[in-house]
UniProtKB/Swiss-Prot annotation:
Gene expressing this chain: bphI
Disulfide-bond pairs as recorded: none
Co-factor requirement: Mn(2+); Cd(2+); Co(2+)
Annotated substrate binding sites: 16-17, 170, 199, 290
Full protein name: 4-hydroxy-2-oxovalerate aldolase 4
SUPFAM superfamilies from the UniProt entry: Aldolase, post-HMGL domain-like
pH dependence: Activity increases from pH 6.5 to 9.
Site keyed Transition state stabilizer: positions: 16
Residues annotated as site: Important for aldehyde specificity, and governs stereochemical control: 87
Record Pfam families: DmpG_comm (PF07836), HMGL-like (PF00682)
Listed result of changing residue 16 to K: 4000-fold decrease in the catalytic efficiency of the aldol cleavage reaction
UniProt entry keywords in alphabetical sequence: Allosteric enzyme, Aromatic hydrocarbons catabolism, Cadmium, Cobalt, Lyase, Manganese, Metal-binding
Organism the protein comes from: Paraburkholderia xenovorans (strain LB400)
Protein origin, superkingdom: Bacteria
InterPro entries cross-referenced by the UniProt entry: 2-IPM_HCS-like, 4OH_2_O-val_aldolase, Aldolase_TIM, DmpG_comm, DRE_TIM_HOA, PYR_CT
Length: 346
């Protein structure tokens, strides 16, 4: 398909999904520096919150270095052309968080649910639209649902008021044909004015290819992160995606070289570990496991002596999804007992 001249809105994940590998410990100065770099490079939309969205600060998901209010309040006044978005997962974030985000100047709210649980998004999507916000329905772990099931869930979110629907490959499991099948079906079912988006992870090195497949299927919003900073092996690497789009004539409005500099000079130096496809993050993609489970599995591995890869494969076998982080340690402990390993950890 000829994509030359097609316009796409790129949505940066560095300061939200990138909080997962940073264990939510990004400083305000790091946030501001990277956000300003992204803004100057021409990125139109930048997501800023705890990795698990508004209200994510908790024992289950991790305590951040600063509150959502502090991060948003630091970044938004500095933006010259970029708008700022926030993620919200019903059950973690509340309507009060929505109002706080609106008051701070957030432009876009993305309401995220598991791909078969769109009905829990009604209150938050409805309220977001009442507040006049650009409102996105975000269907996570989309590889676990058939195209037909995704269509039914997308239509629910559209009916609640979402003006954009995302098909989200949270596990980095999908291949380009999987992406096309799902996004094509959803695109055909939505109103013409409802936008379609795609969020990928790079666990099988498919982030860029899947994003191009999504554009071919009708997506006009694509998520990516500078230097790929995100859960698992990271999100679609923004600087690579922008270069590929430039080669193909897809219009993003982002400067090819400035976004490279943001990735290399601002994002790579703050990484706690190199974001790459190691055996554990590769296993996320292969077994279809939620990407933010990676560090939880590594911690459980160190505690119980069961290889992280084995834990991740078992999580995939059990079909665990986002929100079940507390079950990762339980799974590792059970596996250790079954293997006769001595449980010395407190």
């Amino acid at each position: 398909m000829k994509l030359e001249g097609k316009k796409v809105t790129v949505h940066d994940m560095t300061l939200r999904d990138g909080m997962h590998p940073k264990r939510h410990q990004m400083t305000l100065e790091q946030m501001k520096s990277i956000a300003c770099g992204l803004d100057a490079a021409g990125i139109p939309l930048i997501e800023v919150t705890h990795g698990d969205g508004l209200g994510g600060s908790s024992v289950n998901y991790g305590f951040p270095a600063h509150s959502d209010e502090e991060y948003l309040g630091a970044v938004i006044p500095l933006m010259k052309q970029a708008k700022v978005s926030a993620l919200l997962l019903p059950g973690i974030g509340t309507v009060e968080h929505l109002k706080m985000a609106k008051d701070l100047g957030v432009n876009t709210i993305r309401v995220a649910t598991h791909c078969t649980e769109a009905d829990v998004s009604e209150q938050h999507i409805t309220q977001s639209r009442k507040l006049g916000l650009d409102t996105v329905g975000f269907l996570m772990m989309a590889h676990m649902a058939s195209p037909e099931k995704l269509v039914s869930q997308a239509l629910l979110m559209q009916g609640y008021g979402a003006n954009c629907i995302y098909v989200t490959d949270s596990a980095g499991y999908m291949l380009p044909d999987d992406v096309k099948a799902r996004l094509s079906a959803v695109r055909a079912a939505l109103k013409p004015e409802t936008e379609l988006g795609f969020h990928g992870h790079h666990n099988l090195a498919m982030g860029v290819a899947n994003s191009i497949a999504a554009i071919e299927a009708g997506a006009t919003r694509i998520d990516a992160a500078a230097a790929g900073l995100g859960a698992g092996a990271g999100n679609t690497p923004m600087e690579v995606f922008i270069a590929v789009c430039a080669r193909m004539g897809i219009e993003t409005g982002v400067d090819v070289f400035k976004i490279q500099d943001v990735a290399e000079d601002l994002v790579v130096p703050i990484m706690d570990h190199v974001i790459r496809i190691d055996r554990d993050s590769l296993t996320l993609g292969y077994a279809g496991v939620y990407s933010s489970f990676l560090l939880f599995a590594k911690r459980a591995s160190a505690k119980y002596g069961v290889p992280a890869r084995d834990i991740l494969v078992e999580l995939g076998r059990r079909g665990m999804v986002g929100g079940q982080e507390d079950m990762i340690e339980d799974t590792a402990m059970t596996m250790a007992r079954e293997r006769g390993l001595t449980l010395t950890a407190a």
